[in-house]
């Protein structure tokens, strides 16, 4: 297993993995988003196993309020994914540790994340990795003007 910070030629590999986690997005869309990171404000890590892209993690600094925290900035795990064929080998934990180390290097005292309420696997991963549940919410939106 090799964990590296994705850049240059490895960013498209990470974007392809991210699209497996977030199927509503296209790789080019994610690459464009990642390229807008303010230097030092976000990072993408790539896990390689036997020369094959196996997983990725995206983390960022959040300076706004983060549920359950009392410091700023907070390192935030925006997404983490390991392909099914590579699960159970410690890749997700290694990716998380890379993100946590990145956040520590930027002065963060706390690290946070979120997941869908019905994602039992993600909840178990987070709890097993030392996260404590901070809150459960349901989010709502309402259109204020008619769409054209």
Residue ranges of model-derived segments:
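A short beta-loop-alpha structural element at the N-terminal edge
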Residues: 1-14
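Helix-loop element at the rim of GNAT/NAT acetyltransferase active sites that forms part
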Residues: 15-29
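Conserved beta-strand in the GNAT
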Residues: 46, 52-61, 76, 81
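Conserved acetyl-CoA binding element of GNAT-fold acetyltransferases
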Residues: 70-84, 138
């Amino acid at each position: 297993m090799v964990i590296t910070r994705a850049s240059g030629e490895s960013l498209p590999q990470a974007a392809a993995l991210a699209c497996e986690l977030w199927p509503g997005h296209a790789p080019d869309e994610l690459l464009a988003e990642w390229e807008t990171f303010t230097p030092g404000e976000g990072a993408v890590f790539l896990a390689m196993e036997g020369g094959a892209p196996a997983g990725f993690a995206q983390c960022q600094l959040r300076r706004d309020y983060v549920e359950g925290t009392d410091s700023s900035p907070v390192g935030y795990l925006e997404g983490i994914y390991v392909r099914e064929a590579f699960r159970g080998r410690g890749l997700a934990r290694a990716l998380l540790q890379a993100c946590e180390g990145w956040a520590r290097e930027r002065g963060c005292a706390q690290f946070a994340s979120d997941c869908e309420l019905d994602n039992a696997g993600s909840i178990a991963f987070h709890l097993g990795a030392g996260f404590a549940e901070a809150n459960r919410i349901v989010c709502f939106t309402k259109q204020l003007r008619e769409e054209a």
